[in-house]
Amino acid sequence: MPDLSAIVKAYDIRGVVGDQLDEPTARALGAATARLVAGDDPAPSAVVVGRDMRDSSPALAAAFADGVTGQGLDVVDIGLASTDMLYYASGTLDLPGAMFTASHNPAAYNGIKLCRAGAVPVGQDSGLATIRDEAGRFLDSGVPGVPSPGAVRTEDMLTGYARYLRGLVDLTSLDASPELTVVVDAGNGMGGHTVPTVFDGLNVRVVPLYFELDGNFPNHEANPLDPANLVDLQKRVVAEGADLGLAFDGDADRCFAVDDRGEAVSPSAITGLVAARELARAHAAGESDVAVIHNLITSRAVPELVAEHGGRAVRTRVGHSFIKQTMAETGAVFGGEHSAHYYFRDFWKADSGMLAALHLLAALGEHRAAAAGATVSGLMAGYDRYAASGEINSTVDDQAARVAEIEGVFGPRDGVELDRLDGLTVSLPDGSWFNLRASNTEPLLRLNVEAADDAAVRALVDEVLAVVRA
């Protein structure tokens, strides 16, 4: 019997199919989820279930649905979906949801992302631990049924999802500028299912790359955070003379960009761009004191840009639960992470890489309408202000001791500022900074460095790693 404690993570359920996650386990998790949400006020009548393109997803989703209906709730089966399409369904139908996906993990994996009605995330401290424990009891002793089981009905949400997203972004600039050529790498993931419908009717020529749905990922991992997985897109953008490249991860909730030169665009720069646009939209609606959330690993250009556009930047720890919690507390219009998760107040505070992509297209259309021959690289130059290292992992035996050593080295220096919001962040007088934080699951320290230029980044990385890896 699978060990549920091994597959129920902080924010989702994820494991190797067969060994850790099988149909009886999915059925027990469905029953436990139904029991949890039945206690909500108001109690939902159904649970929305969506799935990605992995070979194991149809059977696991069907078993989960069987567990839900066995507890008297209906299931709304939306079929193949991106994770943000599941959030759209949860929000518009005001129902809890379950998305079967393992995102960018290898083909052997699958998982479940859960939310309550209105796309409110379910994590360990908000119901996932309860689901884990109850599902474990069901696996031990059987799942009790109810006299009147629920039913399954199917619903197509793709067209409504596309229409809703396009309604959140002013895309009229695309019609006022020459047709854009955009290469889209779906990585054989769900972007291949959603992009054609979302982009339909826009003044954009899409060059599709790996749109065939294939959960075995025959071309590359569906994880654009790894630079190796952007290489094909970068080459194709240059070969096509394209204006822009977009890359989606497996469940298409994250979107990365490549500019007209084939260079990767920093997610921090996209955060700054979208923040400026969402602030302008909020101000046009008469709002004041508008907040934007960013985690502490994003570039310091983000709070600078937020301030320049009349907003209030709020800094959080790394992790989507902190972003969503802070968005709820502040009423923030937008939130961004260095990992290319982008959260929108008008999208139930949930993340949507597709919505960020539409903002980027609209901004480029406006840029080109204002200046013939304008490019993404030119557009993003104002948002990508500093050099960054990316995340560098080091295996260490004693994480706390190494962090203390770093504090001892840098803390006494004149003009140095330290903070411990998440790990240790050290800000130097010249404006450079680094964050060192421990992994929660592995004996790793994660280092992120930002400075004025690449040479300064390399020098600071070398200085920190000389202590961390000594």
Language model region names:
Residues 1-64, 70-71, 151-180:
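An N-terminal, well-structured beta->alpha segment
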Residues 97-109, 114, 237-259, 263-264, ...:
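Glycine-rich phosphate-binding loop
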Residues 284-470:
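Phosphate-binding and adjacent anionic-ligand microenvironments
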